[in-house]
């Protein structure tokens, strides 16, 4: 529902990071901040507590992060607090990473298989996907024993299901339809 907002915030920060030549630094620092909020019980309570005022949350963030992160990154966090969007920081990072890949003409292909693909299979898959999408492909491989065999590939909203499990599912649907 809020993907559009997440993208707008991420794009605004990306443009600032790009101007400053600090894209990777901002992404890494934001990930560390998400981990800090998640793992520090006291900070997590402050961020999640609805009765702690926005100004109090902003003051706490300034105390923690001033001098430790870039001023413009801190300003971004304070805007998120002001707009009550700080709880969705992880989504902003995800969108910022997507924007970064888009700017570099890259796509991430999430690949699932029962056994790990060998280098030749990986390269063949990368070559075919690069040709299809006209972009540089980054493979993220995951093992999934429930697939029985074959390969499942997801790039954004596109899915290529070449698994035995997927074929069985297609057959089951056809049989149930008749």
Curated annotation (Swiss-Prot):
Keywords for the protein's UniProt record, in alphabetical order: ATP synthesis, Cell membrane, CF(1), Hydrogen ion transport, Ion transport, Membrane, Transport
Topology of the protein relative to the lipid bilayer: Peripheral membrane protein
Pfam families per the UniProt record, alphabetical: OSCP
Gene Ontology CC: plasma membrane; proton-transporting ATP synthase complex
Listed SUPFAM superfamilies: N-terminal domain of the delta subunit of the F1F0-ATP synthase
Superkingdom classification of source: Bacteria
InterPro entries referenced in this protein's UniProt entry, alphabetically: ATP_synth_OSCP/delta_N_sf, ATPase_OSCP/d_CS, ATPase_OSCP/dsu
MF terms (GO), sorted A to Z: proton-transporting ATP synthase activity, rotational mechanism
Compartments, as annotated in UniProt: Cell membrane
Function: F(1)F(0) ATP synthase produces ATP from ADP in the presence of a proton or sodium gradient. F-type ATPases consist of two structural domains, F(1) containing the extramembraneous catalytic core and F(0) containing the membrane proton channel, linked together by a central stalk and a peripheral stalk. During catalysis, ATP synthesis in the catalytic domain of F(1) is coupled via a rotary mechanism of the central stalk subunits to proton translocation. This protein is part of the stalk that links CF(0) to CF(1). It either transmits conformational changes from CF(0) to CF(1) or is implicated in proton conduction.
Family of the protein in this entry: Belongs to the ATPase delta chain family.
PANTHER family from the UniProt entry: ATP SYNTHASE DELTA CHAIN
Subunit structure: F-type ATPases have 2 components, F(1) - the catalytic core - and F(0) - the membrane proton channel. F(1) has five subunits: alpha(3), beta(3), gamma(1), delta(1), epsilon(1). F(0) has three main subunits: a(1), b(2) and c(10-14). The alpha and beta chains form an alternating ring which encloses part of the gamma chain. F(1) is attached to F(0) by a central stalk formed by the gamma and epsilon chains, while a peripheral stalk is formed by the delta and b chains.
Protein's recorded name: ATP synthase subunit delta
Source organism of the structure: Clostridium novyi (strain NT)
Taxonomic classification: Bacteria, Bacillati, Bacillota, Clostridia, Eubacteriales
């Amino acid at each position: 529902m809020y993907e559009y907002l997440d993208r707008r915030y991420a794009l605004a920060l990306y443009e600032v990071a790009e101007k400053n030549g600090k894209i990777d630094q901002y992404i890494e620092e934001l990930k560390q901040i998400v981990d800090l909020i998640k793992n520090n019980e006291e900070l997590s309570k402050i961020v999640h507590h609805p009765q702690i005022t926005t100004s109090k949350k902003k003051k706490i963030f300034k105390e923690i992060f001033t001098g430790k992160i870039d001023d413009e990154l801190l300003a971004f966090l304070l805007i998120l607090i002001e707009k009550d969007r700080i709880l969705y920081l992880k989504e902003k990072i995800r969108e910022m990473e997507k924007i970064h890949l888009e700017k570099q003409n890259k796509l991430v292909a999430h690949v699932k298989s029962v056994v790990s693909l060998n280098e030749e299979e990986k390269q063949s898959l990368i070559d075919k996907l690069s040709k299809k999408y006209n972009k540089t492909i980054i493979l993220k491989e995951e093992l999934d024993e429930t697939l029985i065999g074959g390969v499942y590939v997801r790039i954004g909203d596109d899915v290529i299901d070449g698994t035995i499990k997927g074929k069985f599912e297609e057959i089951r649907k056809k049989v149930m339809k008749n």
